[in-house]
Regions:
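Active-site bordering "gate/hinge" segments
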Residues: 1-224, 325, 336-379
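Generic beta-strand/beta-sheet core signal
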Residues: 29-31, 207, 232, 239, ...
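Short, isolated positions in well-ordered beta-strands
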Residues: 161-162, 237, 328-330
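Structured core elements
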Residues: 163, 203-205, 228-230, 238, ...
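Short linear motifs in exposed loops
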Residues: 165, 240, 331-333
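Dual-mode signal for accessory low-complexity, basic/Gly-rich regions
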Residues: 222-223, 239-302, 351-363
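Active-site and channel-lining beta-strand-loop segments
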Residues: 225-240, 321
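Internal helix-turn-beta structural module
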Residues: 281-284, 288-363
């Protein structure tokens, strides 16, 4: 698995995202499905002569993880050095409360936390092979227009034709850039801005992939079997695909309470994501273009007024948007990043729990509940 492309991409991540220093202390937590990735990162850190400990964990439920993790965590010396936490999981996002309880004894300014879901070679060779500063400028440019918008019209080459209403006074935006902030957890892969749309009407054609907060071995690619969804007032009223397996899958998803509601309007901004992956993956969601998340929303509790145990992202390939009455359109795949500062009126606090000791999680999908990811088997 460890070829030149992956090796170089891991080093790029450690340099451009983590900004490693010789006196840093790195601890890697990983689930068995991400053992090879964790091992490759560990090997790179060893070559760089960076102190590193590795601790495995069972996904979701592990009664002995807290004790193992406590033994792996170092005592930071006075006068320098950071604690860098890297977690790698394929389908899950585990043990938030336990991890943050352990980390609460460390000074926030000396703590960096990067949590990767969809861990696989492509996480590094594709999604993390673009500098976070570049993603930051793409996000900044879009948010500069969208956060003052009331209406957005969206079209794609695949046939999407949507009219969307925004309520930026009520609904917050999430911006996943891959940039670390004090007291925040960075979710990887990076590259998305998202909010809750006040209203969505029209036709949406998902012709790239889907992503689900569930364990599934389904082929998530939709390039050769697109899905057409008809939306009225933010709810799916009809959907079609020539692929019977896709329709069966959607039937299983949409039968759940509130699963037909649009809970997220998202725009992917990672231009190193090109072809969709077979696996259920957040990497697909970062594809430049538009996606709609059905079911669970990405807003703080109580803002929207409903909950759903499922979040299904349907992802289109590319897209063009028109904002309010501005004649200039924005091609989501190729727009030029503008020299604007990233807004400070965004959130990475989709789900807040006082048990997390004020360390917040960037969660564009809003699928994390009480520090754990809720999962279902859908096949």
């Amino acid at each position: 698995m460890l070829n030149d492309s992956l090796w170089n991409s891991i080093h790029f991540f450690l340099e451009k995202y983590v900004h490693l220093k010789k006196n840093d202390n790195v601890v890697i937590f990983y689930t068995p499905d991400s053992r090879d990735i964790a091992g490759a990162v560990k090997f790179a850190l060893t070559q760089l002569e960076i102190s590193c400990e590795v601790c495995w964990m069972k996904p979701i439920k592990d009664d002995f993880f807290f004790d193992r993790a406590r033994k792996a965590l170092p005592v930071l010396p006075d006068g320098g050095g950071r604690l860098v936490i890297l977690t790698f999981e394929k389908d899950t996002f585990s043990h938030d409360r336990k991890i943050y309880k352990l980390l609460s004894v460390y000074p926030p300014e000396r703590l960096l936390i990067y949590r990767a879901i969809s861990s696989c070679p492509e996480l590094f060779t594709n999604a993390l092979s673009i500098a976070p500063e570049e993603i930051n400028q793409f996000n900044s440019t879009l948010l500069n227009y969208l956060m003052s918008a009331k209406k957005v019209h969206i079209k794609t080459k695949g046939g999407t034709n949507l009219n969307i209403e925004l309520n930026n006074e009520k609904h917050s935006w999430v911006s996943n850039r891959g940039l670390a902030r004090v007291g925040r957890t960075v979710i990887l892969p990076p590259g998305e801005v998202a909010t809750y749309p006040a209203n969505v009407t029209g036709i949406f054609v998902a012709d790239f992939a889907f992503n689900l907060n569930a364990i599934t071995d389904q082929d998530t690619r939709l390039q050769d079997r697109p899905v057409t969804l008809y939306l009225d007032k933010g709810i799916v009223v009809e959907y079609h695909s020539k692929c019977k397996d896709v329709i069966k899958f959607l039937d299983q998803c949409f039968e759940r309470l509130n699963a037909k509601k649009v809970g997220e309007l998202g725009f992917g901004t990672n231009r190193n994501v090109h072809a969709p992956l077979y696996m259920n993956s957040h990497i697909n969601e970062r594809k430049p273009g538009v996606h709609l998340g059905f079911g669970q929303h990405n807003q703080p509790p109580g803002v929207v007024g409903y909950q759903c145990e499922l979040h299904l992202d349907m992802i289109a390939d590319g897209g063009t948007i028109w904002i309010d009455d501005i004649p200039k359109s924005i091609d989501l795949s190729s727009f030029l990043a503008e020299d604007v500062l990233h807004t400070d009126r965004f959130t990475d606090e989709d789900v807040f729990s006082p048990e997390l000791d004020d360390i917040s999680v960037e969660d564009c999908c809003g699928v994390y509940s009480q520090g754990e990811m809720k999962l279902f088997n859908i096949n």
